[in-house]
Amino acid sequence: MNYKLATKSVLEDNSWIKPGLASWEWWHDAALYGPDVNFVSGCNYDTYKYYIDFASSFHVPYIVMDAGWAETVLNPNKPNSQMRLPELIQYGKDKNVGIILWLSWVAVEQNFDLFKTYEDWGIKGVKID
C-alpha cells in the first residue's frame, strides 16, 4: 500500500539504504532478567553486548540504542563511557549486527555534522524523535 500511495522517489541511487529488522530495548527499559543474565542490566556494555548476541543468534541485522547511549541527550558526540561504544560497534560488526543510535531532533538540529562522525564510527543508522 505504501508503494501505491507514495510519490516517486527523488533519489536516483538508493543502493546505500539497507532496511532490516531491529531489536529495540526501549520496550522493556533495558531491564534484562533470566538465568543467563549475570550482570547488572541498564545502559552499559554488558547489556548491549547481550542484545548484540541476541540479534546475531536470531539473524536480526540491527539493534537500536535508545536514550542513554550518549552522555547527555543534547550532546550526541560524546558516548556514555559505560557503553564502551567503539567496542560494541566492533563486536556488532564481528557478529553481523549493526548499531542504530537514537537521537533527539533538537540534538540533530544543533549538531548536523554528526552524521559524518557516526559514519566514521561505523554506526549503521539513526532513529530521530
What is the predicted function of each stretch?
Residues 67-129:
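Aromatic- and carboxylate-enriched substrate-binding clefts and catalytic-loop regions
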Residues 1-94:
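Conserved structural scaffold segments of CAZyme catalytic domains across common CAZy folds
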